[in-house]
C-alpha cells in the first residue's frame, strides 16, 4: 500500500482534499477501486485514481497526478483504465464532480466523454461550486 505517496499526491495536487484516515479507508475497502501508476526505477507512485462501486455505477472520488509528472498523459491513462475496467464491473455510468472553475479538468473530462448533468453549490471547503459529470458505459 502506498499510503504516504497517496497523501503526498493529494496534498500537492488536490491541496489536501483527504485526511490520512480517509486514504486508509479508500485503499483498504473492497468496494473501492484504487488504481495507480508507479515509476519502475524508484517504485514511487506518480498518479492515482480511486472510485466507489455503487451497484451499477462507478463514482470517481479522486484522480490526481504528482505535479512533476502532470501533462504527460498519466491522468488519461488512469481514467482510460478505469473506464475499461467498468466493463467487467457491469456498470451503466461513471460519475464525478469537478470544481466549476477548473477549466483544464473540465476540458479533460469532456475529451474523455463526460457530460455535465448538474451542479452542487458550495460543494468544496472553500465554498466553491462543483459540476456533476457523467459518462454512459452501458456495460450490462
Task: Show which residues each predicted segment covers.
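Positions that flank functional sites
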Residues: 25, 101, 124
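Conserved glycine-rich acetyl-CoA-binding loop
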Residues: 44, 62, 66-80, 89, ...
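Accessory recognition modules or surfaces
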Residues: 76, 128-137
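Conserved catalytic-core motifs of GNAT/GCN5-like acyltransferases
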Residues: 97, 110, 115-131
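Acetyl-CoA-dependent GNAT
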Residues: 3-68, 79-81, 85, 89, ...
